[in-house]
Amino acid sequence: MGQCLGLVQIDQSTVAIKENFGKFSEVLEPGCHFLPWCIGQQIAGYLSLRVKQLDVRCETKTKDNVFVTVVASVQYRALADKASDAFYKLSNTREQIQSYVFDVIRATVPKLNLDDAFEQKNDIAKAVEDELEKAMSAYGYEIVQTLIIDIEPDVHVKRAMNEINAAARLRVAANEKAEAEKILQIKKAEGEAESKYLAGVGIARQRQAIVDGLRDSVLAFSENVPGTTAKDIMDMVLVTQYFDTMKEIGASSKSTSVFIPHGPGAVKDVAAQIRDGLLQANAERND
C-alpha cells in the first residue's frame, strides 16, 4: 500500500475505503488507483480480507456447580461486498465478537453437567457460531468456523476427576488380576486332580503286579519244596517284606522317626493278625 502524486497501491486480499471530502465514496479493490487529493478524494483506511482468529476465554459454571473456563476459537473475515459496513459500523471487531461468545457460552454451559459439557463441545461451538453468524453478518463479517478447543475445570475439580479415573482403572486392573488368579487356581486344581488320578492308577497297577508276583511265588515255592504249606510260604513272604520295608525307611533321607517292632517275632504277630482278619472275613461271607 502506498500513495504518491495521487496514485494509490492496494495490496492483494486488502480493500481500501475511499472518501470524498470525508464522505464515503466507494471501496477500492487491489491494484493501482488515482486519487486527486486536490478535489477532496482520499483513503479513509484499509480493510484486510484475510481470515483472522480470536481465542476467547470465558469463565462460567455448569449445572452441577463446577466452575470451568471455556476456551473458544473464532475464525472470521470481512466480506468484500460489505466492506463499508465492516469499516464504519464497528469500532472494535474483536471486542464485539468476544461479547457475543461470552453471552452464548454463559447461556448454554449452565444448562449442562460437567461431563455433558465435555461430550457436547461441538453443540456448544455450533450454538456460538450460529449466534455470531446472525449478529456479525449485519456488520459485514463472515464467521468461518468456531471451535471449543478446551474446557478447563477448577484445579481441585480436575485433581478429583483424575483420582476418580485412576481409582476406576485400578478397580478394573484388580478385577482382571483376580480373574487371572482364579483361572490359575482352577488349572492348578485340575492338574492336581489329574495327577492324583494317574497316581492312583499307578498304585493300583503296582499292587496288582505285587499280588500276581506273590501268587506266582507261592505256587512255585510249594511245587519245588515238598511238605510246605501255604501258611509257611506266606510267613516267609511277610518276613521278607518286613525287612524290605525297614530297609527302605532307613535308606530314605526324608523319613522321620518311625517306631516299629524290630524283632523277628513281630512278624508272627503281624501274620497272625492278617490270618485272623482273613478267617473272620471268610466266616462272615459263609454266614
Swiss-Prot record:
Pfam families given in the database record: Band_7 (PF01145)
Transmembrane segments: none
Keyword vocabulary terms for this entry: Lipoprotein, Myristate
Alphabetized Gene3D superfamilies for the sequence: Band 7 domain
Keyword Lipoprotein (UniProt): yes
Lipidation (N-myristoyl glycine): 2
Domain of life: Eukaryota
Protein task: Positive regulator of hypersensitive response (HR)-like cell death. May be involved in potassium ion channel regulation.
UniProt-recorded name of the protein: Hypersensitive-induced response protein-like protein 2
Organism: Oryza sativa subsp. japonica
Lineage of the species this protein comes from: Eukaryota, Viridiplantae, Streptophyta, Embryophyta, Tracheophyta
UniProt gene name: HIRL2
